[in-house]
């Protein structure tokens, strides 16, 4: 017996008729299933107990032998072996076919294996197998060729002409005879000879035939086994038939398909016994062939067999295929024990590594652990009574549960799991109620919110699994995002707002200019109302105990606010005191301009000093990243908890709310709108006089209204109070952006219609005034499109991730250095005026490929195979170096993977990557995860055909599939200069490029935006117009590195 749990791999081969018979426990002769009166399986039918085993444990069919003591006895009345009913999941039967039948996988699959072995086209095979033509199996001494097809008429004519000196046949029998006659050794030798001279199509065909024939030779399978003489019948419990309430039966589709095969097979046997005319027999054989095809792969050929309601029946192949098939549904992804799911709510008092688990859920999940502990402590005599105690919820089980879950991490998962941070480990804390409590800071990683999201809990059982969860998956360790190395646990919403409010500065407010000896004195004054959080005050610098202050600074007063003192109290003492949201203050030290001698008139000094900005979400992220860099994980997660608590506390104390009175009205709105209407009228007049085309008029109108909206927006911001709650929310980065504000208080602006073209009628109202019916209607298009896009793109993005993981999963860090001597030349990635990724960002954490020297002093800045630290990465562009050679995975020589040096540092830990890290999957998830946030739309530049450029998710798919892009740009094949750009008929332009040897002209559409002008120098592979370059064309014109660089730049966008 083979050990089912311990095997290296599975090998799939052809089963010979004898093999199928040896698996079988008997032949299924009748199509009957269950007797409708007795509900017992029919003898010799599809559920026969004699073949497949008894339906009840240790009991034969007729009831003569019952009980275990008759184990293994075969009943002399009904012939059923007394054994467990579980064997009905294991025992197979068989059907002896009255005529050979071809196996559809080998005849219809691509490429057709049967066709390759016989060197016949699939079309010819189909004609023979389905009884449309005869095939010559033995030519004898006639003028016919072996494997020649004959129609009915030709066959008759040749029979009369040659008599019995040749043999021809139809159906799978004829194919079987041909397959039996194949001489594998001889064919292989012939093909190897042919390959020496063959060219083109013949060569590829020969190679494919050779592959199949060699496979047959090595595996020991016989080609004729591709035609079935015996059909296996799978065990009945795997294709069950169950009685529903109401007396009807529900059955697996396979039973219907088997019934058709048996019916046709029996009819064919009867016809053969009766010696029926060949045309009737042929028709019956064809029907049998179709029935077997339907059973193995329904719908592969012709119309699928349908059940009630025209539903195609699920055949054996469908049981295995696709997302719902056996592999992806049951083998690779099972539902597991020791898991549960519930709604999540916020747990603001939790530590970073904790989650709240409802009691009833915890007792169910940890049941075996609790039962063991109860019996060990003597609270229960045996496992059974322990189980009863738990089911009755006896009071003593709760203390035991508390002890059991201590130090036992659980995994929390939120679907969709788009990247590895979608499953993290936490230590459970028992909570009342039925909702899971989640730490607010991990919401970003899970992309969770508390509006009814659900999460699943899984319990790692073995000590190894627990250790793995604790060391690798504990939430407190996942502070950096694996895709870019930036903090992923950043405060959001209330927490940002609280810290923003805490660090605000205001003038002429109670207690301004007071001097305090230390923070405690300041806090007492604040609690008693003598000073406000936002009051600018002075405090003795020494009392703050900050280790970054110099001796001189410690003898002085520090000008700060009460709120900033509180804010800094959560930071480590060796971290600079943060007084202003600047890089200098964060990375070097507190600027000395905020320190004044103790003799200063503080009030007068403060009045002269400019206001400092509060700390926004971006600043908080920078602080977290810096703390992580200096103090590593443990300290950072403690600090994050402190920042969270402080944020919640002060956003509550601030009492920031939103009311209609917070939405202010812009005084000059009517004048701005009137001026824009006049401009639009002017443009329309010019259009009517024929001074501009309709397209130009449309673009001008759109520009006018966009300018009006911007003007309103600027007026709004200028007239806003810095303490306006809506402004604070969007300025801090807690929620919303300035355009929300403009729509509430300014105007909604232009909207797109369902096709994506912008409607030139603007919505001049805002939400405070309310929209009229037409405006409401116009804005409903955009809203609807947004919702449908979101639904569609989630599925697309998931599928993209799946394909990316499929190709990248074998890319693993295999070695330290691959000894490659070349690398990649990197510089800023630029798109038009904006820089997408700076040189510093590209260098940090990578290894150098060549020595880099300072252009002026000529000193060595970095040697080959050394790591670019942040300092070096910043110093290089500062020295005026524009491009650098780095080691890259593109040029890595490692077999089946990459090396440490070419990959660079591990972004999720900030330290060097470990050998064995699955970097391919990390990369695939990092591209797939933001995919859901990308737009689905094709951008319409005013809806002109030809200038649509695909963006967002579809663009990413286009790059990875190396498709010919939509709106593809013409590129030059020469290095030289642009000599002329001429307009031609039928809306085309011709661009002439002259190189050193030759001149070429390129035709581009009139509407395309050109990237070059006359006199420009161009290099091979440069695009001449806007749009996406076809990577295959670029590869043809340039080299691999150029294409890799282009694709890299495109994905970065």
Swiss-Prot record:
EC number(s) on file: 2.7.7.6
GO MF annotations in UniProt: DNA binding; DNA-directed RNA polymerase activity; metal ion binding
UniProt xrefs under SUPFAM superfamilies: beta and beta-prime subunits of DNA dependent RNA-polymerase (SSF64484)
Keywords: DNA-directed RNA polymerase, Magnesium, Metal-binding, Nucleotidyltransferase, Transcription, Transferase, Zinc
Family matches, as Gene3D superfamilies: 1.10.132.30, 1.10.1790.20, 1.10.40.90, 2.40.40.20, 2.40.50.100, RNA polymerase II, clamp domain, RNA polymerase Rpb1, domain 3
Enzyme class, broadest EC rank: transferase
Protein name according to UniProt: DNA-directed RNA polymerase subunit beta'
